[in-house]
Amino acid sequence: MENLKETMRDVLENNILSYWLTKVKDEENGGFYGRVDGNDQVHPEAEKGAVMNARILWAFSAAYRVLKKPEYLEAATRAKDYVRDYFLDREYGGIYWSVDYQGNPLDTKKQTYAIGFAIYGFSEYARATGDKEALDIAISLYHDIEKHAFDAENNGYIEALTREWNPIADMRLSDKDENGSRTMNTHLHIIEPYTNLYRVWKTLELEKSIRNLLDIFTDKLLNKETYHLDLFFNDEWEGKRNIESYGHDIEASWLLHETALVLDDKILLHKIERIIRRIADAADEGLRPDGSMVYEHWKDGDKYDLQRQWWVQCENIIGHIDLYQYFRTEEHLQTAIACWNYVAKHLLDNKNGEWHWAILENGMVNKEDDKAGFWKCPYHNSRMCLELIERDY
């Protein structure tokens, strides 16, 4: 496994993070550019997204925590300062969805998903450095979500609200999503940062929130017939249950496992481990013989999106390494290694750096989508590298 760990460190440092340090830093307006397209062209006047910047903060903070390189601390601090100075809403709390290239608020809605990633980034910076300001911001954002986005009547977290925390008509994260008032994706990316915050801020109120989120996954989001996670719901937790998202399933399997491990409750862990193994088995329906994982299955019409998106492969690898580490299932190790070989051959851009967005169904590289942008950040792939470096498997 040492060879695999060495490979991960090399890819992390010389393919992923080096790209963001040399290509994406915005020296004129601060922070990082909002977009580098699939042909490596920088778009210096592109809007800057909260999710992208929070994920940059997380990635460099985590890299510094593990590797202790000063250039990673410098980049993490750059991201922290930018999110603090330009995305934090000092008047109403929470963070803006986007700012323009000069840092002026552009879309001021409060998307719970984005606030979750800000907690993830600030809590990781605090974990890596002990910085009190970063921890205080993460705690404040946690309280913003609990005060405004948590629905105590129906349980669960509301997808989006206006800047002033009032109801909003269009709650979608992106044009591809259904307009549901609560989604699996947002709940996944709330439990993930809450778990990380718990590592540095162990309080009963946060533990209660996390345990409730686990219950939401097992009681509301999990499809008891298929063991896939259903994606979109209304206030009463009614949904079409018509999409199977393999990448989200395998990502949830290891993130929910991580949460149970961090809470350190043996009875809870036993319950969650039985469930996450079933979720991972369901996710494996998306595997192909080369170890790669396809994107989605729409049960209406039985159609598949056969793209091999970069982030799905990252979560596929972590999820199967997690299963091998804790349950010693050799086939899961082989799946992870096969998927990594696919990534190394097809998705890594060894000439220009970073990873391509996807390999299309016809086998061609997807260059229509970004190398760096609103939804393309050094998060899934740097986390995959760091997970494989840090874990004992």
Q: What are these regions, as identified by a protein language model?
A:
Residues 1-393:
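Glycan-recognition and catalytic cores of secretory/periplasmic carbohydrate-active enzymes
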